Amino acid sequence: MSLSLWQQCLARLQDELPATEFSMWIRPLQAELSGNTLALYAPNRFVLDWVREKYINNINGLLNDFCGAEVPLLRFEVGNKPVSQNDSPPQRVVTHTPVAPAPQNTSVRPSWDNTAVQPELSYRSNVNPKHTFDNFVEGKSNQLARAAARQVADNPGGAYNPLFLYGGTGLGKTHLLHAVGNSIMARKANAKVVYMHSERFVQDMVKALQNNAIEEFKRYYRSVDALLIDDIQFFANKERSQEEFFHTFNALLEGNQQIILTSDRYPKEINGVEDRLKSRFGWGLTVAIEPPELETRVAILMKKADENEIQLPGEVAFFIAKRLRSNVRELEGALNRVIANANFTGRAITIDFVREALRDLLALQEKLVTIDNIQKTVAEYYKIKVADLLSKRRSRSVARPRQMAMALAKELTNHSLPEIGDAFGGRDHTTVLHACRKIEQLREESHDIKEDFSNLIRTLSS
């Protein structure tokens, strides 16, 4: 056996696992083969436990394949593998002029901002203390994003830099940004963590140019420990801002300072942003946040009700969650309306009461999302005819969109499987069930299918 054993395992795992899972959990592992023991070193306890729980069978299976009777014992440890005399430490190439250190006086606002009249901290974190990992409701739709954010919070500037989170409005991207910021500052009280919307970066740069203070602007942004920027897509067509952010990005990365970005779309799909920036957005880890599935929507409602000290019956939470599906913000807004109505009227929160309190919202939702609407939207998306979806044709170009439309009908409407099958050319309910399971499987395996599903959900729910 040789040290190339782990490289062989990596190659196979990269083929077998979804790219996001491989990048998040397997790539950070370091391996050391000593005698008949293969030690795998994880960057932290969270990764170690996850790999041991989820992937140990995959790894042991590959070791059996490659080693036969001489399978090494597998050992997991937290930390870096010991550096042997033959190992040469990696060299970092600095390709820019080193940035001047941050000013020691942190009791004033950045000097490019001439609106300052009262002293305040230079590093205005803008991190909302209310958004933490503890009150972020985890589900299948956001599990990877939360896990990635948690790892970044535990090890900023490490393996996942930058971290790029993308997904539709109101799905929890901003919550995770604040959660990371709060966690970093809890571990290190003097950490320089800055959260902002991308438009704030643009405004600060314009102010710096107007006040002839661009060097101070650069020094400020390049000396933070963690830069958290929301809605990076608003950099589109702002060439000077992109130019400045490009150099800021490079400086932070070379200084092992953490960058987290969010967007409403996949990096390569952001129009009006330079290719060199889009390429850098994908250097670390890119993770999607999907619209929450039913169980997560119910959990969000129950947790929100608990925070408001409201007893929300389970059947009521299920009723709301089944009908409002697009995002977390919509769910919370609906629950706030229900709670307010209950407080004003003194009535108990029942399904009938909720149906009355959310009458306009539920009517709009039911009007927007119908099977007919789903069929038209899917047909347009895949550039086929609605008649193709209803036909007996089984070619891939028609069968896959048909399965997608059936899965969306199950997700977005209250129709039963037989009713959905009926609407698709009189198909049996087992055909609909197979379609739903197939799309669920493909969303795990195929980035394209996952993107298609998210895009269609977003279109139909907007």
UniProtKB/Swiss-Prot annotation:
Binding-site residues, ATP: 170, 172-174
GO aspect biological process, one term: DNA replication initiation
This protein's UniProt keywords: ATP-binding, Cytoplasm, DNA replication, DNA-binding, Lipid-binding, Nucleotide-binding
SUPFAM superfamilies for this protein: P-loop containing nucleoside triphosphate hydrolases, TrpR-like
Main location: cytoplasm
Cellular component GO terms held in the UniProt record: cytoplasm; plasma membrane
Region (Domain II): 86-125
Segments passing through the bilayer: none
GO molecular function: ATP binding; ATP hydrolysis activity; DNA replication origin binding; lipid binding
Keyword Metal-binding tagged: no
Positions of the UniProt region annotated as Domain III, AAA+ region: 126-342
Gene3D superfamilies for this protein: 1.10.1750.10, 1.10.8.60, 3.30.300.180, P-loop containing nucleotide triphosphate hydrolases
SMART domains in the cross-refs: AAA, Bac_DnaA_C
Record's keyword annotation contains S-adenosyl-L-methionine: no
NCBIfam families for the chain: DnaA (TIGR00362)
Family: Belongs to the DnaA family.
Assembly notes: Oligomerizes as a right-handed, spiral filament on DNA at oriC.
Cited PANTHER family: CHROMOSOMAL REPLICATION INITIATOR PROTEIN DNAA
Entry's free-text remark on domains: Domain I is involved in oligomerization and binding regulators, domain II is flexibile and of varying length in different bacteria, domain III forms the AAA+ region, while domain IV binds dsDNA.
Function as written in the Swiss-Prot or TrEMBL entry: Plays an essential role in the initiation and regulation of chromosomal replication. ATP-DnaA binds to the origin of replication (oriC) to initiate formation of the DNA replication initiation complex once per cell cycle. Binds the DnaA box (a 9 base pair repeat at the origin) and separates the double-stranded (ds)DNA. Forms a right-handed helical filament on oriC DNA; dsDNA binds to the exterior of the filament while single-stranded (ss)DNA is stabiized in the filament's interior.
Entry protein name: Chromosomal replication initiator protein DnaA
